[in-house]
Curated annotation (Swiss-Prot):
In the N-terminal section; belongs to the MGMT family. In the C-terminal section; belongs to the endonuclease V family. Its main location: cytoplasm. PANTHER family: ENDONUCLEASE V. It comes from Picrophilus torridus (strain ATCC 700027 / DSM 9790 / JCM 10055 / NBRC 100828 / KAW 2/3). GO terms for molecular function: deoxyribonuclease V activity; metal ion binding; methyltransferase activity; RNA endonuclease activity, producing 5'-phosphomonoesters; single-stranded RNA binding. Its EC number is 2.1.1.-, 3.1.21.7. InterPro entries: Endonuclease-V (IPR007581), MethylDNA_cys_MeTrfase_DNA-bd (IPR014048), MethylDNA_cys_MeTrfase_DNAb (IPR036217), WH-like_DNA-bd_sf (IPR036388). This is Bifunctional methyltransferase/endonuclease. It holds the Pfam family DNA_binding_1. Transmembrane segments: none annotated. Residues 1-79 are annotated as: Probable methylated-DNA--protein-cysteine methyltransferase. It comes from the Archaea. Keywords: Cytoplasm, DNA damage, DNA repair, Endonuclease, Hydrolase, Magnesium, Metal-binding, Methyltransferase, Multifunctional enzyme, Nuclease, Transferase. One of its GO terms (cellular component) is cytoplasm.
Length: 298
């Protein structure tokens, strides 16, 4: 498992922008390794508290418009003009001022490679415990994650919580690198089937959070997502690249196997829990994370 402080890595890239030049959120995302990270780049820049040493003002939109800045647009304009950059009608000429030749190790590409390797290790034959289950969810306030594991055995619920800072923002396709540290801590001593509020096999690289968790922790796992992020529906099954990777029980309950369970068994498992509705144990986990985030107590 790779662990990356993506905030610090992004901020280090800004130091490469020459004086009198700017870059775009998309250029930074490409330097990280995936253009899908452009929105996350904007978020991470908005969280920068060291505005004197980390020049976030040098990042603009792909159409040359200025975008936002934590110290306000007037201060952004002042700093850009102090660097000798011309601004006309609220835009900068990217042909003249654009820098995108970053020296980068492309960390997100490395994570993609890791996901592909982990996907190859996932097992989709049945080897799971249906009598001992847990659900895990994480809720966030800024960079702090509030996580809860709800386990159910012998008709009794048990709860564990874990609070930790994250240095990896939400980027579609990379949820494992944001949430796995919480799941690892909460579930390290659990020996049943894990139900994860995310996808498993249903993922562009067949390695959603539930698969990542299941393989790394060597546990049976099932992903249950509340929205369809990829694929198309045919007779309830979710197809991606012409392969059935998941199943939509309803518009808010999309199931895919994570590890050590088949697609059909995953569907039956979740249906038995929720009677064609979103599983109650996941609802409890979600409500508890929200309460933990709001109050820091349960």
């Amino acid at each position: 498992m790779q662990s990356i402080d993506l905030y610090s890595y992004l901020y280090s890239l800004l130091g490469q922008i020459p004086e009198g030049m700017v870059t775009t959120y998309g250029d930074l995302a490409v330097a990280l390794g995936d253009v899908k990270a452009a929105r996350a780049c904007g978020y991470m820049l908005s969280r920068n508290n060291d505005t004197e040493n980390i020049p976030c003002y040098k990042v603009i939109m792909s159409d040359g418009s200025l975008g936002g800045y934590s110290l306000g647009i007037d201060e952004k304009i002042r700093r850009l003009r102090n660097d000798g950059i011309e601004i006309n009608n609220g835009r900068i000429d990217l042909k003249r001022y654009r820098f995108n030749n970053f020296d980068s190790s492309y960390p997100l590409k490395r994570l993609q490679e890791e996901q592909e390797k982990i996907a190859g290790l996932a097992v989709y034959s049945d080897d799971y415990n249906e009598d001992k289950i847990c659900a895990i969810d994480v809720s966030y306030k800024d960079e702090i994650g509030y996580s809860v594991m709800v386990s159910f055995e012998n008709n009794e619920y048990d709860f564990k919580t874990f609070i930790k800072e994250t240095r990896f923002p939400y980027i579609p396709g990379y949820l494992a690198y944001r949430e796995f540290p919480y799941i690892k801590e909460l579930g390290k001593n659990f020996d049943g089937t894990m139900i994860i509020d995310a996808n498993g096999l249903l993922h562009p690289r067949r390695c959603g959070l539930a698969t990542y968790v299941g393989v790394i922790m060597n546990k049976p796992s099932i992903g249950v997502a509340k929205s369809l992020l990829t694929g198309s529906i045919k007779n309830g099954y979710v197809y991606y690249n012409n392969m059935p990777l998941g199943y939509m029980i309803n518009s808010r309950t999309i199931v895919s196997p994570g590890n050590r369970i088949s697609l059909e068994s995953s569907i039956n498992f979740i249906r038995n829990l929720g009677k064609d509705h979103y599983p109650e144990i996941l609802k409890i986990a979600h409500d508890r994370t929200v309460a933990l985030r709001r109050n820091n107590i349960i």
